[in-house]
Amino acid sequence: MMICHQCLDQDDSSEEEEAVSVYSPSTLVKLARQRLLREEALVISALKGLPNMLFPVIFEEAFINGHTKILKAMIPMWPFPYLSVGALTNNCNLKTLKAVLDGLDILLAQKVRSSRCKLRVLKWRDEQHDFCGIWPGSHEAEDLPELMTQKHPVQNNPDCGVKKELRVTTELSVMKGRLDDSATYLLEWAQQRKDSIHLLCRKLVIETLTKDTVIEIFKIVNADCIQELELYSLCLEDLAFLNPYLRQMDNLLELTLDHVTDSLSMGDSEMCEEEMITLVSQLPTFPCLQKLCVNDVYFIYGNLNEILRCLKKPLVSFCISNCELSQSDLDCLPYCLNIFELKCLYLIDIPLNHLCLDPLGFLLESVRHTLECLELKSCDMGEPQFNALLPALSQCSHLTDVSFWENELSLLFLKQLLQHTSKLTQLSYELYPAPLECYDDRGLILSHRLEQFCPELLDILRAKRQPKDIAFVTNPCSKCGRYYVYDPKTQRFSLEDTTL
């Protein structure tokens, strides 16, 4: 039997049924999509006999194009244990969400379920996974059983271990104090079906806290199932309010604190130092925390030891940016054993020119066998500060990424720095500041000098190893914000305005 491509596109269901036996899967996928767009009722009626391999592509097409009846009908027949909608939810509307949840309601209401349906976990909003998660076997290890695949599982975790008919995992974002309509509807839906549905929030983002919204979230969501928490634009009083919930987050892996001020939520008054110290000391211990990112948080100054006290397991990634540190903050580093296995250390926009960095050098020596990424950017570091780090830096043999941009180093000292980094054979990304000789007395960038000095600097590295991705960059222009970048491949400089 032969069928031409023109006949294949004709609206003849009998011919299409015959084509199933002779055409490749890719052709069948195309045919299924065409039929989907033309006859919604036919697709729904054919679901019982539809091959498993066609379910994902038809579901995707229905989701993107808003075929809510098809979505509702497919859920009770889903032939895989997992359905990860992933990035598709970014552009979906409330009507689409309701259709998916209506499908789950049909499934829950069935006294005798179809032998074909194997759905156990619906991943609704998950930025880390795309739509490929609907294919069988793609993410099965993540939820079998709950929390057992974590590196540091918590032994006593009854809430997350509850066995219910279905699990729905999602990410929630409270923006400007409120949830969006879809998240609100999902929470209300889950609350009404709490006996049969287990709603898990893996990632919670809060930007500007509204207490009523947070209370409603934790009436439904188990805090000990949250693995990523991002807090933006809060005051210390807000952290005090969140503290009871933070104490329940025994499985938290990543924590971001961004722009936390000392102003009270009511009025412009500020907390006294004693109140601040009390609140900071009450921050809970996180048994599983692996990544900590702190940006523009005023209470870090003089209290870094209290922050690091919250760690129970060794930290993997530590980032501090747009903060001020005291000498006592640095002095505590050699005694914080929970940062001695760091893979990534980022200190960004922190003035260090007035501090003794010997303790930081000790930390680098302690993590020399684990550290892979080191960023000391825009820290106003000069030669005395770098001198304290160079002996330990040259021992960090596992480093793959380094950035020392926006620090003040002379040409002579930059050569000395490169003599040390030339020994680091695993480096694949390097960002160095242009030497001070590339500026005149007024701070004007002398781009021709950058082009003159950089080949000489590169030769220092090439004598020991072949650099991969490397650049020498001037400080940003105070007027336009752009900077000159020397590219070794073209042996020319260029004016850039993109983020490095």
From Swiss-Prot:
GO biological process: negative regulation of apoptotic process; negative regulation of cell differentiation; negative regulation of DNA-templated transcription; positive regulation of cell population proliferation
LRR repeats: 116-143, 198-222, 223-248, 249-285, 286-311, 312-343, 344-367, 368-395, 396-420
Tissue specificity annotation: Expressed in ovary, specifically in oocytes. Detected in follicles with two layers of granulosa cells, and are present in early as well as large antral follicles.
Keyword terms, alphabetized: Leucine-rich repeat, Repeat
SUPFAM superfamilies tied to this protein: RNI-like
Similarity remark: Belongs to the PRAME family.
Protein name, as recorded: Oogenesin-3
